[in-house]
UniProtKB/Swiss-Prot annotation:
GO terms for molecular function: D-glucose transmembrane transporter activity; kinase activity; protein-N(PI)-phosphohistidine-sugar phosphotransferase activity; protein-phosphocysteine-sugar phosphotransferase activity. The EIIC domain forms the PTS system translocation channel and contains the specific substrate-binding site. This is PTS system glucose-specific EIICBA component. The gene is ptsG. The chain crosses the membrane at residues 16-36, 63-83, 89-109, 126-146, 170-190, 199-219, 273-293, 303-323, 329-349, 355-375, 383-403. It comes from Staphylococcus carnosus (strain TM300). Disulfide bonds: none annotated. InterPro entries: Dup_hybrid_motif, Glu_permease_IIB, PTrfase_EIIB_Cys, PTS_EIIA_1_perm, PTS_EIIC, PTS_EIIC_1, PTS_Glucose_EIICBA, PTS_IIB_1. Residues 425-506 form the PTS EIIB type-1 domain. Keywords: Cell membrane, Kinase, Membrane, Phosphotransferase system, Sugar transport, Transferase, Transmembrane, Transmembrane helix, Transport. CDD domains: PTS_IIB_glc. Induction: Up-regulated by the antiterminator protein GlcT.
Length: 675
């Protein structure tokens, strides 16, 4: 029961990231628009006092503000899409459900426009509907309900005379019905829930605010490995606390109150549950990255320098910390625990200094500048000395403990690797056994790089055995296991499914072959070759790819390209080794024996081929510059996590790889040398 609930929480936490990702754009517009209307910036740049400039500034502030004013519907749409694998029908259902819920609650409670205008009543005008104020939580509830309706009814069959309403068209209909029913209990119980939340938050802060902010920072950081931190901080940011803004509306949540106080140009009281991130993300973690680099083995420092520099800059500028945190989380849990304690203490220290800083996305310099320095409404400069002290503490602690306990942080790993003597034909049987057997498999899937398995009991999974069988990495998220077997992952998954269905009973019947391994051995003794850019765009370091399978080089080394166009051409003369069924990735082999994976975008496997047109098939011979794939780039931008495209050499095996060009490239430019 708990494991299933935990898995659902992880999915909800991930779904919350879609609407949260909108907030930085809203914050940028609001912060700049507000700053341009402020005396501080106008005294430095008198020309911005011009009427035209001020009108633009007001429009910018209004454009950003309207997003914060409508967070409830944004969260409803975002959560629905996130929990329904990106299908737009779920968003339509969420919108239908949102307006039905609010209209029904408003009519049931007899809410008039006059009542909604009085914030003290707990009512509000939501999209012009006088109704009960349920805030972001109401949006999340509707989004989750819409996703449930979609997943339950998207493929429903109806009698032929009702066939038009079958399938996905049935989802909004059911959502309207469910929302109408939900409105009555919501109208009855929500006022008590909101009152309880307010009483809890006020009591928490009144009893011991310092302890509250410390525990918030400490617990939030500890939840990051489980992906539950987004759920934990949501009540603090969007529901706890209250503030009556200049328009007479009651605003709930630390983040929303902070933004409203910026807009109202009043003294700040919010930010207690956000500001502690700045010293850690801008100073502490970059210093930890320096310690990890300096304690790496000499022969590995060049590689580690790139990883740590990228992670440190990401943390400093944007406040995205996972690339750094996951570099030491699993190999040195003690460091992560100390990191969590220091994070909580940072919240406490800034509270004791009576600072009030906030952000729209995370505690990086961009938010610090836009919502701290520009508004200039609190003593933001105190973050700098606190941060410098934090940098020293992080560096000293990390360096000392890494050396003292010989933690295998990046660059300090043992080089000895246990090789697998298992025949390729036996691999699906061995992997199934390592996963705990057929009875332990709840759901089996794969993409071109990894085997994705949801298990019933994670304790029955032998992670070390999976690595010994050839997995370059094993990721564990709740009861979901991801074993990185590279391009043969789909073959392994296919054969495992056939074994579980009783269709394969012996190794001789499997489809996984040793051909690739034999060729790899031959190639390792041969020369190298050149890889030419298959896509026009910007070449970036592979460590910048926001997917650990690629950024940590579990599949191999290479580059990534941020594409400007959707045309993919052959990067060398060779042969097509694999075209994934969902068309988002293609495996090639050059005449020099270089095996290359081109993986267009991230999580594009979920698009099921939409937006992709493959122009070749497996075993086709190809020549340099030959078109391989046409991609609808606009569709991918709208529906995928990212368009960044990893281009990975999957069979280096002792050879070296050199990146020949960074920055802007056109098709046919030399980008990789294997030697």
């Amino acid at each position: 029961m708990w494991k299933k609930f935990f898995g659902q929480l992880q999915r909800i936490g991930k779904a919350l990231m879609l609407p949260v990702a909108i907030l930085p754009a809203a914050g940028l517009l609001l912060a700049l628009g507000n700053a341009f209307q402020g005396d501080a910036l106008q005294s430095l740049m008198p020309f911005i006092k011009a009427e035209g400039f001020q009108n633009v500034a007001k429009m910018m502030e209004g454009a950003g503000g309207i997003i914060f004013d409508n967070l409830a519907i944004i969260f409803a749409l975002g959560v629905a899409i996130g929990l329904a694998s990106g299908d737009g029908v779920a968003a339509i259902a969420a919108f239908v459900g949102f307006i039905v819920l609010n209209k029904t609650m408003g009519m049931f409670l007899g809410v008039t426009p006059e009542k909604a205008a009085d914030a003290a009543t707990g009512f509000a005008n939501v999209l012009g509907i006088p109704t009960l104020q349920t805030g972001v939580f109401g949006g999340i509830i509707i989004g989750a309900l819409a996703a449930w309706c979609y997943n339950k009814f998207y493929n429903i069959s109806l009698p032929s005379y009702l066939g038009f309403f079958a399938g996905k068209r049935f989802v909004p209909i059911m959502m309207a019905t469910c929302s109408f029913i939900l409105a009555f209990p919501m109208a009855i119980i929500w006022p008590s829930i909101q009152g309880g939340l307010n009483a809890f938050s006020e009591g928490l802060l009144a009893s011991n605010t310092g302890l509250a902010v410390f525990l918030f920072g400490f617990i939030k950081r500890l939840l990051i490995p489980f992906g539950l931190h987004h759920i934990f901080h949501a009540p603090f940011w969007f529901e706890f606390g209250s503030y009556k803004n200049a328009a007479g509306q009651i605003i709930h949540g630390d983040q929303r109150i902070f933004i409203e106080q910026i807009r109202d140009n009043v003294p700040l009281t919010a930010g207690k549950f956000m500001q502690g991130e700045f010293p850690v993300m801008m100073f502490g973690l970059p210093a930890a990255a320096l310690a990890i680099y300096q304690t790496a083995k000499k022969e590995n420092k060049k590689v580690v320098a790139g990883l740590m520099l990228s992670g440190a800059l990401t943390s400093f500028l944007t406040g995205i910390t996972e690339p750094l945190e996951f570099s030491f989380l699993f190999v040195a849990p003690l460091l992560f625990f100390i990191h969590a304690v220091l994070d909580g203490l940072s919240f406490l220290i800034l509270y004791l200094l009576d600072l009030h800083l906030g952000y729209t996305f995370s505690g990086g310099f961009i938010d610090f500048f836009l919502l701290g320095i520009l508004p200039n409404k609190t003593q933001w400069w105190l973050v700098i000395p606190v941060g410098l002290v934090y940098a020293a503490i992080y560096y000293i602690i990390f360096r000392f403990l890494i050396v003292k306990f010989n933690f295998k942080t990046p660059g300090r790993e043992d080089k000895e690797v246990k090789s697998s003597n298992v025949a390729a034909s036996e691999l699906p049987f061995k992997v199934l056994d390592a996963m705990g057997g057929k009875a332990n498999i709840k759901h089996l899937d794969a993409c071109i790089t990894r085997l994705r398995v949801e298990v019933n009991d994670k304790a029955k999974v032998d992670v070390q055995e999976l690595k010994d069988l050839g997995a370059s990495g094993v990721l564990e998220v709740g009861n979901n296991m991801q074993a990185i077997f590279g391009p043969k992952s789909d073959q392994i998954k296919h054969d495992m499914q056939q074994i579980m269905d009783g269709k394969i009973t012996s190794p001789e019947e499997t489809t996984v072959t040793e051909e690739g391994d034999k060729e790899t051995a031959e190639i390792a003794a041969a020369g190298g070759g050149v890889v030419y850019a298959p896509i026009k765009g910007e070449v970036v370091d592979i460590s910048e790819v926001p997917d650990k399978v690629f950024s940590e080089k579990m599949m191999g080394d290479g580059i990534a390209i941020k594409p400007e166009t959707g045309e993919v051409v052959a990067p060398f003369d060779g042969v097509v080794k694999m075209v994934f069924p969902t068309k988002h990735a293609i495996g090639l082999e050059s005449k020099d024996g270089i095996e290359l994976l081109i993986h267009f975008g991230l999580e594009t496997v979920k698009l099921e081929g939409k937006g992709f047109d493959i122009l070749v098939k497996e075993n086709d011979n190809i020549v340099l510059g030959q078109p391989l794939m046409k991609v609808d780039l606009d569709y991918i931008k709208e529906h995928a996590d990212s368009t960044i495209t990893p281009i990975v050499v999957t069979n280096l095996n002792g050879r070296t790889m050199e990146v020949l060009q960074h920055g802007e490239v056109k098709q046919g430019d030399k980008v990789i040398l294997v030697k």
